[in-house]
């Protein structure tokens, strides 16, 4: 909110308090996540239903993760010992060193941090998901035009995947017979005028960074962290990614 950056795009969960209390606006969701738990294989635990009183849990202090963890254990009537740190690397190091029985954060984070463990194969992520964690870009309140530009930049990437427009074929799609595709690549209509942009602003996004699927593959799937997109698949393919049409 200090004005040092124009956009924040990281693992920040969209919540009511963050949206309403601190002068920020979430423009959309670019990753649907959920909180889970990691344990050591030799613990014999394969489900959160096996958690017992006295369990210790590592997490980040001052986060929705910490609040979700508290709510989860309280709702199950399980007494637990929180082991909280400010930095993610500190949490991972503490868990890896055996200072806690389980490590909890968003499941994407668990998958990524598991690769940093001394022996990654000694750890498993439990199947249960205990929260909804919609993650997405954030801008400061008070600049409606910039907010719209960021929102529709995200929408462009998702819609481009839906219509098969990629960084490789975007220019060729200008001659498509589909009016929606033509609008998406700036060959028809005046989609940029409302933002003070030219008509190929969304075409440049697609050519430079690709559609949503290309971005997911490059940054997540190809790393081996989460090859299965799960809810982050298009709505036409069993996921929940769905954006308003560009028209």
Feature map (PLM): residue ranges:
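Short, well-ordered beta-strand segments
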Residues: 8, 38, 56-60, 103, ...
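Sec-exported extracytoplasmic/periplasmic mature domains
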Residues: 1, 5, 42, 56, ...
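Conserved C-terminal helix/tail region of periplasmic/extracytoplasmic solute-binding proteins
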Residues: 217-247
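Bilobed "Venus flytrap"/periplasmic-binding protein-like clamshell domains
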Residues: 13-14, 33-93, 108
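Extended ligand-binding regions for polar small-molecule ligands
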Residues: 40-45, 49, 63, 109-110, ...
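Extracellular/periplasmic bilobed ligand-binding domains
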Residues: 86-122, 137
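Extracytoplasmic
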Residues: 2, 21, 32-34, 52, ...
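Acidic, polar ligand-binding/catalytic clefts
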Residues: 1-50, 107-131, 244-247
């Amino acid at each position: 909110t200090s004005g040092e950056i124009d956009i924040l795009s990281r693992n920040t969960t969209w919540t009511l308090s963050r949206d309403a209390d601190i002068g920020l606006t979430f423009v959309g969701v670019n990753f649907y996540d959920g909180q889970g738990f990691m344990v050591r294989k030799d613990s014999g635990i394969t489900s959160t239903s096996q958690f017992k009183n006295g369990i210790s849990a590592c997490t980040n202090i001052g986060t929705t993760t910490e609040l979700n963890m508290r709510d989860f254990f309280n709702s199950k009537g399980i007494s637990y010992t929180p082991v909280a740190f400010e930095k993610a690397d500190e949490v991972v190091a503490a868990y890896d060193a055996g200072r806690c029985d389980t490590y909890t954060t968003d499941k994407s984070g668990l998958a990524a941090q598991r690769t940093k463990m001394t022996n990654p194969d000694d750890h498993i992520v439990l199947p249960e998901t205990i929260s909804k964690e919609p993650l997405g870009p954030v801008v400061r309140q008070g600049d409606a035009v910039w907010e719209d530009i960021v929102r529709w930049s995200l929408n462009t990437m998702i819609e481009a995947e839906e219509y098969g427009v990629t960084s490789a074929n975007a220019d060729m799609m200008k001659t498509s017979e589909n009016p929606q595709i033509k609008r998406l690549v700036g060959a028809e209509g005046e989609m940029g005028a409302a933002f003070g942009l030219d008509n190929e602003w969304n075409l440049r996004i697609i050519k430079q960074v690709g559609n949503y699927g290309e971005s997911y593959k490059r940054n997540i799937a190809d790393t081996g962290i989460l090859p299965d997109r799960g809810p982050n698949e298009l709505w036409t393919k069993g996921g929940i990614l769905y954006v308003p049409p560009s028209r």
